[in-house]
Amino acid sequence: METSILKTAVKNFLGNSPDWYKLAIIIFLIINPLIFFFINPFVTGWLLVIEFIFTLAMALKCYPLQPGGLLAIEAVIIGMTSPQQVGHEIANNLEVVLLLIFMVAGIYFMKQLLLFAFTKLLLSIKSKRMLALAFCLASAFLSAFLDALTVIAVVISVSLGFYSIYNNFITDQNDVINAKHDNHIDTAKKKQTLEQFRAFLRSLMMHAGVGTALGGVMTMVGEPQNLIIAKNVNWDFVTFFIRMAPITLPVFICGLLVCFLVEHFKLFGYGTELPERVRQVLEDYDKKTSAKRTHKEKAQLIAQALIGIWLIVALAFHLAEVGLIGLSVIILTTSFCGITEEHALGKAFEEALPFTALLTVFFSIVAVIVDQQLFTPFIQFVLQVSETSQLSLFYLFNGLLSSVSDNVFVGTVYINEARTAMQEGLISHKQFEYLAVAINTGTNLPSVATPNGQAAFLFLLTSTLSPLIRLSYGRMVIMALPYTIVMTLVGLLCVEFLLIPVTDMMVHWGLIALP
């Protein structure tokens, strides 16, 4: 009896995850305290970061909340950080938490409008290259005014809608979320078409994801860390855009060029066309829904469009915290679309809350990074070199650390360290402003390398869409690789050779004023 209970308990641990994965997590939990107490806390800190990245990489084997959460709880228990520091990190990032809870749910209630708009876009543009550019451009434009997580939530919602339409057509299975295996598909031809459609959606999702980085780096509201950096150097919306332009505009152009080339030459998993059969299904669906659209549904679309305008205006002018704007979207859409039942409201939060919990665990890891001073050696090294080398090194170290850590945290740490150096007289105010540009671009551009570098990518990886279209951590890294290389190198070259002369030119033209 006791043996069977023990076996069941072992089997219950991390559920249906592979045995080797369960064993790896147990080994991590055993060795971390030993290394912390008997070898070196600093080494343990970096080991914990690597282990957490491992749980993210294996997201399709087991949702990272459980294994990552166990590692974080143990880190607090053994003294790598404190509950107070974890609470402090969560408080510092409350805006992001509110964004996830309310904004993503708000977008859920605008799904009807978004599916309508993106279906028209998808069906009206026949060329895959042009469609990829359209998705990338749309994501970049929206991310300049909205948060990247909001934009990626929109695109996930739309892609899930496309997938649902075709999945329901080829099967009798209406619950697309549970249709993660292909056993319900009766012919090889249908399976082949579905695989092609998955590849098509994967490429669109990655183009859209990179688009959020290309647009998000440009403005002070594009990413949470942008706002923090802008406040430190006292830049307004227009000044921030102009000061970033010597790096962001060339990177944006090169990013769009990469988008076109990988589609044209079918590289890194891109280039798959929309299957003609799927296009036909989507066109038929669009015609049927248009023909059957009632006055009530038309009124709902108009209401959602007006609320969408409110959303963009409110975010662009930062009329309130992003999460509170999201809450207003929930209230307005549900009020004017007639959604008043509690269970209907609850569905909107199903997508975001697991990721919100995961991000909170991530803040626990960030608390360890702070308490164990894991980034201190990098910062001290950079501040010791000459001013001309500081810009490139700040950019590179920000990019490297943002690829393995939260880019909000990295940007905040580096801008605070740069400000402290200025206050202590180690660097001039002019150099501080140049460093702010290097820090902002460094945290936003190279961090597309891995899903844990960009919160939007991590949200995509852990969404219900990823297993449906077979978008794993490894595949995301590979598909992001051409963008990572080009955006990082072009950004570095612009920081090294264009930032100072172009800024001086803009000062001469009277566009900006240097201290």
UniProtKB/Swiss-Prot annotation:
UniProt record similarity statement: Belongs to the NhaB Na(+)/H(+) (TC 2.A.34) antiporter family.
GO molecular function terms attached to this record: sodium:proton antiporter activity
Native organism: Photorhabdus laumondii subsp. laumondii (strain DSM 15139 / CIP 105565 / TT01) (Photorhabdus luminescens subsp. laumondii)
Residue ranges crossing the lipid bilayer per the database entry: 23-43, 45-65, 96-116, 136-156, 204-224, 245-265, 305-325, 349-369, 393-413, 449-469, 480-500
Keywords: Antiport, Cell inner membrane, Cell membrane, Ion transport, Membrane, Sodium, Sodium transport, Transmembrane, Transmembrane helix, Transport
Subcellular location: Cell inner membrane
Main location as per UniProt: membrane
Highest taxon in the source lineage: Bacteria
Reported function: Na(+)/H(+) antiporter that extrudes sodium in exchange for external protons.
Membrane topology: Multi-pass membrane protein
UniProt-listed InterPro entries: Na+/H+_antiporter_NhaB
Keyword RNA-binding: no
Catalytically driven reaction(s): 2 Na(+)(in) + 3 H(+)(out) = 2 Na(+)(out) + 3 H(+)(in)
GO cellular component: plasma membrane
Protein name: Na(+)/H(+) antiporter NhaB
